[in-house]
Amino acid sequence: MSTKQVTCRYFLHGVCREGSRCLFSHDLTTSKPSTICKYYQRGACAYGDRCRYDHIKPPGRGSGAPADHSNRSSSSAGASAPGPGPPANTSKHLKKPLVLRDKALCSDSRPRVFSAESSELNECWEQRDDGAQKPHSYLEAIRSGLDASAAAAATAGTFPELQQTSPQICPFLAAGQCQYGESCPYLHGEMCEICRQHVLHPHDPEQRAAHEKKCMVAFEMDMERAFAVQQSQDKVCKICLDVVYEKSSPSERRFGILSSCAHTYCLNCIRQWRCVEQLHNQIRKSCPECRVVSEFVIPSIYWVEDQEQKNLLIEEFKSGVSKKACKYFDQGRGTCPFGGKCFYMHAYADGRRAEPDKPRKQLSAEGNVRFQNSVRLWDFIEEREHRSVPQLEDEVNDLGELFMQLSGASDAPH
């Protein structure tokens, strides 16, 4: 059957947003509206007589032809049992309902009736004070059942397995407040003097000792962090003369700690100093103030002055950068100029670690040190051919001028 022969259900309610592009029919005169309740055919329509769709039995189920919409109310009223409750199924073979009389499984004191076919239907109905039937959601039924069962378990002791093991600390009171009070099935812990939370077990000394130890370690770390911040807040960079913690950008509020020096520098300034190519290599690696050579700079958000703390910071720095790939080695495609002194990881593309070779150095005539990745004879020949000799030409010109002056002075008359 074409979809154009089926009436659009959204058009019936006046909320079809597709309009003329809708695949279903918007003509009530020529279309075949489907008004049969599919939930009634499954045996679980929660609306009963108030349902807007036709309650017609599917072919092959039940006895007789499908019931008409006009006699739907009379047949359902005659088949339903007296008293309040959800509409029952109009089948010939009615199964005996199951009555649960455990008060701990219900939100009130009344027993709940469940049928094998219509358990989902009966769970969606409850009794009101005026005798009418009111459907509610599954979430409310589950929540009310859990609250009632938890309260009954705490008062009557219906869960003996909880008494055999150590009771759990109440997570609600540990988070701040427990709304169940004395009816809470969990154990309310005592307050910890360090973290100020109700998480201490009143009868388990091992749990108390473990939690207090954990809190003490966290408290000591917080105190060390507070002391480090207090020690670092007034440090001034020796290059830009600005307080490091008062810089405008948060990324600039970091210290560049030299490995062999105790002078204060911000990370950006000391890195710019060590990247100046016009200076000698020994001068670039030295401190701008005391000229002590430091092999590397350690970035840190706190200022560290004690030597033991600096050594610990150096080890953490080396351990951190050793997990990063070296950009000069480039997974075996390049050569690292630092060789075995490189702090970064030298590994190939397949994950194998490489043993870096010792770098070869070359000292030029000007005193500059250059790293040689590969030494070839053609490199020396090419360098000699393109080498300029400005000093030799200047010396020849000076000697020529001096010879001309001497020859002119000797030819002059006395």
From Swiss-Prot:
Region of interest: Disordered: 57-94
Keywords: Cytoplasm, Developmental protein, Differentiation, Metal-binding, Neurogenesis, Nucleus, Repeat, Transcription, Transcription regulation, Transferase, Ubl conjugation pathway, Zinc, Zinc-finger
EC number: 2.3.2.27
Biased composition (Low complexity): 73-82
Localisation per UniProt entry: Cytoplasm; Nucleus
Domain of life of the organism encoding this protein: Eukaryota
Zn finger intervals (C3H1-type): 2-29, 31-58, 164-191, 320-349
GO molecular function term, any single one: zinc ion binding
Function: E3 ubiquitin ligase catalyzing the covalent attachment of ubiquitin moieties onto substrate proteins. Inhibits neurogenesis and axis formation during embryonic development by modulating the phosphatidylinositol 3-kinase (PI3K) pathway. Acts downstream of PI3K and akt1 to up-regulate gsk3b mRNA expression.
The protein, known as: E3 ubiquitin-protein ligase makorin-2
Organismal lineage: Eukaryota, Metazoa, Chordata, Craniata, Vertebrata
